């Protein structure tokens, strides 16, 4: 059945700030305590969504989460009114207020893992929410993520949204950032590639930075999503690249249909994996970038692989990149040669996403890929689908509510809490989501 890939992009939240919360993510650490611009961050994301929608790709939006997360601060022993809870946390434990105020839900590649209906035993689209339990500031996202996804994918006859795995290290799950799908047309049954960093049965693991995804989690997600067992491949990410700052697989590899674009050091036992995929995927085309052309360090700094690989109607592909890739002479030289070569990637499109990039999130981090048939697209909440009217409405909404300057010290401002709630209350009406936030319930 004919299907299309829909990119659901995360809208950057009002508390976007730089606090270095994500150990293992070198951009996050490098930009700690710098001044952020939430308004610019949100607009940069919206501009990417609008440009891709204008280019003919189906584009949708996922809203930010309520921050500061007052409920989690109460769980940690701060009491009083909501404003007092924020003030006490900011005074006594600013690092906890910062974590509870993180806008990290913008990176919706970590929101869930998706299985299109062509791959599932029951013929439904399945989405399993990620628990993100390796990082405190992200482990609190799952409950609201589940509510939001249920408000977008409401038709139970077509969609199944599963709650996150148990919040323990054994089942550490980072969502679609560690998942790729390889096949022919989007509507064809395809091979799902689940990538993990850690297997508790004793395989080699990274030593400097944590491996956030476990094999046990990937196996559980494949079961929950009812992926046909004959269409699943599990592969370990190279632990050496995790130790160089490749905290998710989407920092070192991206796939689209029959193409896997990756670094030659991306996976453990890479030759064996590619041979397996060649057996499973008709017309499989790996594009491996050699270290001599682009080092792992340069890939991490430029987010060359944290790109979007999108199919045009004629079968050619567009590679959507952050500006940092264009700014790096060696990386841009490689890419300029790539589009001249004998492969489907025929065009490069560059976006300025520096506000997100400074916290370690590029184009691929900002989007959740969901392959849908036309009937399934019609069953999605239509208010989240990007068009001229929604873009203008959201742009005006950002202008009305967002600050253009934010530091960690500003998070204690009770007005920021009120601004955020007022903004999100308006947003749920724009996107027809109902009461998905704690303050609305």
UniProtKB/Swiss-Prot annotation:
GO terms for biological process: arginine catabolic process to glutamate; arginine catabolic process to succinate. Its EC number is 3.5.3.23. It catalyses: N(2)-succinyl-L-arginine + 2 H2O + 2 H(+) = N(2)-succinyl-L-ornithine + 2 NH4(+) + CO2. Pfam families: AstB (PF04996). Substrate binds at residues 19-28, 110, 137-138, 212, 250, 359. GO terms for molecular function: N-succinylarginine dihydrolase activity. Keywords: Arginine metabolism, Hydrolase. The active site is at 174, 248, 365 (nucleophile). Pathway: Amino-acid degradation; L-arginine degradation via AST pathway; L-glutamate and succinate from L-arginine: step 2/5. InterPro entries: AstB_sf, SuccinylArg_d-Hdrlase_AstB. Belongs to the succinylarginine dihydrolase family. Homodimer. Catalyzes the hydrolysis of N(2)-succinylarginine into N(2)-succinylornithine, ammonia and CO(2). This is N-succinylarginine dihydrolase. It comes from Enterobacter sp. (strain 638).
């Amino acid at each position: 059945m004919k299907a299309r890939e829909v990119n659901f992009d995360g809208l950057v939240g009002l508390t976007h700030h730089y606090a270095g919360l994500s150990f293992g993510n070198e951009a996050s650490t490098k930009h700690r305590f710098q001044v952020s611009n939430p308004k610019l961050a949100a607009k940069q994301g919206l501009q990417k969504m609008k440009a891709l929608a204008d280019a003919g790709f189906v584009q949708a939006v996922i809203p930010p989460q309520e921050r500061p997360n007052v409920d989690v601060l109460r769980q940690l022993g701060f009491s009083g009114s909501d404003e007092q809870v924020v003030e006490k946390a900011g005074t006594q434990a600013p690092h906890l207020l910062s974590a509870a105020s993180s806008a990290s839900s913008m990176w919706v590649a970590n929101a869930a893992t998706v299985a299109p209906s062509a791959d599932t035993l029951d013929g439904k689209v399945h989405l399993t929410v990620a628990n993100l339990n390796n990082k405190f500031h992200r482990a609190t996202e799952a409950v609201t993520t589940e509510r939001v996804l249920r408000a977008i994918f409401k038709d139970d006859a077509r969609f199944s949204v599963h709650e996150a795995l148990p919040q323990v290290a054994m089942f550490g799950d980072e969502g679609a950032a560690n998942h790729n799908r390889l096949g022919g047309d989007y509507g064809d049954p395809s091979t799902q590639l689940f990538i993990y960093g850690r297997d508790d049965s004793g395989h080699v693991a990274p030593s400097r930075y944590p491996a956030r995804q476990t094999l046990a989690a990937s196996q559980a997600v494949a079961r929950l999503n009812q992926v046909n067992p004959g269409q699943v491949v599990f592969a370990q990410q190279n632990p050496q690249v995790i130790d160089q700052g490749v905290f998710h697989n989407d920092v070192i590899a991206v796939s689209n249909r029959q193409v896997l674009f990756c670094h030659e050091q991306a996976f453990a036992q890479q030759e064996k994996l590619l041979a397996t995929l060649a057996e499973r995927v008709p017309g499989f085309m790996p594009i491996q970038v050699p270290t001599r052309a682009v080092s792992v360090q340069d890939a991490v700094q430029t987010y060359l692989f944290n790109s979007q690989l999108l199919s045009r109607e004629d079968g050619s592909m567009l590679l959507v990149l952050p500006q940092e890739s264009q700014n790096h002479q060696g990386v841009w030289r490689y890419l300029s040669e790539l589009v001249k070569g004998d492969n489907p990637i025929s065009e490069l499109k560059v976006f300025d996403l520096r506000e997100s990039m400074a916290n370690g999130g590029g184009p691929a981090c900002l989007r959740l890929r969901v392959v849908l048939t036309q009937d399934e697209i019609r069953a999605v909440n239509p208010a989240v689908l990007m068009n001229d009217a929604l873009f203008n409405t959201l742009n005006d909404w950002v202008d009305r509510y967002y600050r253009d300057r934010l530091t960690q010290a500003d998070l204690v401002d009770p007005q920021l809490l009120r601004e955020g709630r007022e903004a999100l209350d308006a947003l749920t009406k724009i996107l027809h989501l109902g009461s998905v936030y704690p303050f609305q319930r």
